[in-house]
A protein has these predicted regions:
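Blade/loop signatures of beta-propeller domains
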Residues: 15-33, 69, 194-195, 199-201, ...
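Beta-strand-rich domains and repeat architectures in extracellular enzymes and scaffolds
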Residues: 37-73
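Bacterial N-terminal signal peptides
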Residues: 1-8
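Residue-level detector of Asp-centered blade-edge/turn motifs that repeat once per structural unit
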Residues: 52-53, 102-103, 146-147, 235-236, ...
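Short loop/turn segments that connect beta-strands within beta-propeller blades
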Residues: 79-83, 123-127, 201-205, 264-268
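Hydrophobic beta-strand positions that form the internal "hydrophobic ladder"
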Residues: 54-57, 104-108, 151, 240, ...
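A flexible loop/linker signature enriched in serine peptidases of the S9 family
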Residues: 61-74, 89-95, 110-120, 134-140, ...
Length: 329
């Protein structure tokens, strides 16, 4: 039996940019077949954050329009028990990456309202919106320190480790000179990579910060799916722990050995929390299975697998993260 699908879209609302909001669809299904149209009519929950007092949850929902071939990401706030979901987004601008300020009195989020992706904040009822970051590049992710005096910001930086830079006199050329592996993630060519920056917050505003991976051709968060879960602050707001696979080209393509690093904002020093200071990686033969490589048969635990998503314990004494035992796909 074929299902009958009826969609009644939410009434369009003009936003600040005079665009039309793609809102929640009212879905009526009869029958036993779930169709592609029904799937696209459903909202999809994305990122979320819990308030410091654990009483509220802010989260994103993306709604889709097959006719317009685009989506709209909005913010909702609800009680921690699931009651009273309230739509906070009232314009056609996409709003994402929500978080609570350290005091729990306001909500921060990313918006392109100013012409580029920047950090904004608003009251818990969605009013009193104002721009917080004024960076020269798009902000792709962020995380404020517990004391609210600093913020980690994610920006994309150019990279030429696997794809050569285009000639200046051929800016419209679509051709590429590929020199190594790791030149592509799924459908995306790797011409830029994410780096994390740390910036001061003064009078409720912030701007460009210091690149923690300055001059290094490595990613944080790691492509293609990494996000703000891959970096975190210590409770005293001094240290930053982050995930990084410090490899390029063929070595990156065949290895899953990422590590957890700790950056000291007071000294500017970085240390690897996964490897002993005297660690030297055994040579890997790309023609052989990783199962039988020397790196997976060391006489001590050097965290040679996929280490990611670090977080401090509430008292700041420990760092926990997710880890795989061995190197290799």
């Amino acid at each position: 039996m074929t299902a009958a699908l009826t969609l009644a879209s939410a009434s369009p609302v003009s936003g600040a940019n005079d665009g039309q909001i793609i809102g929640k669809n009212q879905i009526t299904l009869t029958g036993d077949r779930l169709t592609p149209e029904a799937l696209w009519a459903m909202g999809r929950i994305g990122t979320f954050a819990v308030s410091p007092d654990a009483q509220k949850i802010v989260y994103t929902v993306s709604y889709y329009s097959v006719q317009q071939n685009k989506s709209h990401t909005v913010l909702y706030l609800m009680d921690a028990n699931g009651a009273n979901p309230t739509l906070l987004t009232t314009t056609a601008d996409n709003e994402s990456e929500p978080a609570f300020t350290p005091d729990g009195q306001r909500i921060t989020f990313l918006s392109g309202k100013s012409g580029s992706s920047q950090i904004w904040e608003m009251a818990l009822d969605g009013t009193s919106r104002r721009q917080v970051s004024f960076c020269h590049k798009d902000v792709e992710g962020y995380k404020f320190s517990p004391d609210g005096k600093k913020v980690i910001i994610v920006h994309s930086v150019d990279t030429y480790t696997s794809i050569e830079k285009k000639y200046d006199d051929l800016p419209l050329s679509s051709g590429m000179v590929i020199t190594d592996l790791n030149y592509k993630h799924w459908d995306r060519y790797v011409t830029t990579i994410p780096h994390i920056f740390v910036a001061d917050v003064q009078d409720g505003r912030t701007g460009d910060g210091i690149d923690l991976l300055n001059g290094e051709p490595f990613e944080c968060p790691m492509l293609p799916f990494g996000g703000s879960e891959q970096f975190n602050w210590s409770p005293d707001s001094r240290h930053i722990v982050y995930t990084c696979r410090k490899k390029t080209g063929r070595d990156y393509a065949i290895s899953t050995d990422s590590d957890i690093y700790r950056y000291d904002t007071a000294t500017g020093q970085t240390e690897n929390l996964c490897k002993p200071a005297d660690y030297k990686e055994p040579e890997i033969d790309p023609s052989r299975s990783m199962e039988h490589q020397a790196i997976n048969h060391l006489d001590r635990d050097c965290n040679v697998g996929y280490d990611t998503n670090p977080a401090y314990s509430p008292d700041g004494k420990y760092v926990a993260w997710l880890s795989m035992a061995r190197n290799g796909y």
